[in-house]
Amino acid sequence: MQQFEEVRTILEKAKKITVLTGAGASTESGIPDFRSANGLYADANVEMYLSRGYYNRSPKEFWKHYKEIFQINTFHQYKPNRGHRFLAELEEQGKDITILTQNIDGLHQVGGSKHVIDLHGTLQTAHCPKCKMGYDLQYMIDHEVPRCEKCNFILNPDVVLYGDTLPQYQNAIKRLYETDVLIVMGTSLKVQPVASFPQIAKREVGATTILVNEELTGQEYNFDYVFQNKIGEFVEGLSSIK
């Protein structure tokens, strides 16, 4: 309980809080961890189907697999969970908080967070590769192969595909170097370059670092506080302190 008290005090005093979230932030909403043994990435061909090269070569087939892999026709059923709401509430209290998320579900924004950097893009939108007009998830659901209404070009999803660079990487690094506190929630820290963020925050920036993850990551030495809990349990622990 002492750790919860200390972390609550740290969050109350912090000027700039940065939160890195992974799949564990969304599994409590019922969204499968795509990288788990039984997840949607378990198919050996998934990396090919979700690659920039495949989209460029076979955009119609790409959209078929994209919709199947991410099950976008049922995506509206997923709702923000207590972890999403907790982060949004911190922002509503006036905290300068930015979320760096590896998730592509858009639930941080749906939950009310305003300052979110989608490191791997988002399933919620797509755009025309020619005129850049944006389209929402419902438009993608309604059209087997979604095309721009103006240009008739097949839409480009706003998820970062294999073979793409991370367009938001520099923005994320800039935020890391400004932060007082880094909270890492629901990620195994196995995927680079995101896996290096805790070390940057602790060793180079001198920020207080907090890990919330059910399983150990092998990077516990980069954290001042380690909570081997579900995110909902962590939030409950903080909330129980009077």
From Swiss-Prot:
Compartments reported by the entry: Cytoplasm
SUPFAM superfamilies named in the record: DHS-like NAD/FAD-binding domain
Domain of life: Bacteria
Binding site for nicotinamide: 34, 104-105
Family annotation (InterPro entries): DHS-like_NAD/FAD-binding_dom, NAD-dep_sirtuin_deacylases, Sirtuin, Sirtuin_cat_small_dom_sf, Sirtuin_class_U, Ssirtuin_cat_dom
Binding site for Zn(2+): 128, 131, 148, 151
GO cellular component: cytoplasm
Domain Deacetylase sirtuin-type: 1-242
CDD domains hit by this protein: SIR2_Af2 (cd01413)
EC number: 2.3.1.286
Top-tier EC class: transferase
UniProt-annotated binding residues for NAD(+): 23, 27, 34-35, 102, 104-105, 120, 187-188, 213, 231
Cofactor annotation remark: Binds 1 zinc ion per subunit.
Known catalytic reactions: N(6)-acetyl-L-lysyl-[protein] + NAD(+) + H2O = 2''-O-acetyl-ADP-D-ribose + nicotinamide + L-lysyl-[protein]
UniProt GO MF annotations: histone deacetylase activity, NAD-dependent; NAD+ binding; zinc ion binding
Keywords: Cytoplasm, Metal-binding, NAD, Transferase, Zinc
Cofactor: Zn(2+)
Keyword NAD in annotation: yes
Record: active site: 120
Family: Belongs to the sirtuin family. Class U subfamily.
Function (record text): NAD-dependent protein deacetylase which modulates the activities of several enzymes which are inactive in their acetylated form.
Protein name: NAD-dependent protein deacetylase
